[in-house]
Amino acid sequence: MKTTLNKIRVHSPCANGWEKLLKNLGKTRADDEPLALTTILESNGLDDALWCLRAVDGHEREMRLYAVECARSVQHLMTDKRSLDAIDVAERFANGKATQQELNAAWGAAWGAARAAAGGAARAAAGDAQANLFILMCEGAL
């Protein structure tokens, strides 16, 4: 999965992350050379690589399935059925087996569950698993 520095720049990246990426690429300004998201991951880390997904054309299905896999990697921590149901609906939607209306309803219910169970421990535990899944998504292995 690839983007370009010009596509990233259009979305106004944070100054620190932008300068770090340019430096690690040995560049001083944006260009249209294809840039692998895994290169951004190696340079700047998972948060910046995920942020750069907004600068990728297409691949909506892969991105949604990545989110599903990230959620599944920590679903053992989920105790609210609304969250588990939302994962299933998101996967079905990515595969063309659920409607936008079903997805919206599941999303709303899941946010209600998330607000009820908000906590940083689950997010921290998921970080490494998400980075590994991100690489698989970028390589087309999901």
Where does each model-flagged region fall?
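Short, glycine-biased loop/turn motifs at secondary-structure junctions and
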Residues: 1-142
